[in-house]
């Protein structure tokens, strides 16, 4: 079935995204919307085109019953209420085995190019030998960052489709066991998805640190200057 949605301004999506913790448990999320959210994650930036991020869809009640026993206690009500949980994981084997495939393809398609110093000789004799000998803990760090980018894309797609979302944690090794992860896969975070049981207004606007406290100009600690009129567009 084709995706049925109304086009939403991207600035509006950024401004209205909230962490939603109350869902309508009686309203199922359409499969095509789940697919669109997962496609947004799939299409996010992937280092070396290695495609190391996985998303496991948890929708069946029996899986949810097992899964919700091993998430953080304060997240259990939300995980039970949400019709869907997407479980994001990184897979180190996909790094070690995927880079030798994905990076040459990226070069041939012009994603990395000679004007920046890339060549097949450089890829095969320098870049790949270096990247594919990174220790697992370094690969996990890099792929955790990559997973975050995929999750951000998924959250924005969910918001654009009129759905709520909220990331939550759990017992990684037990989650891996319940969902059948291979040893190379590592749980990063789960994301509740569903039709909101609360409005954007009731969720409120979360206060953030002042712009200049975390956004710097040229050097760490030198506050960047924000234009209030720009901020107003996002609130």
Regions found by a protein language model. Give the residues of each.
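Acidic, surface-exposed loops and disordered segments
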Residues: 1-235
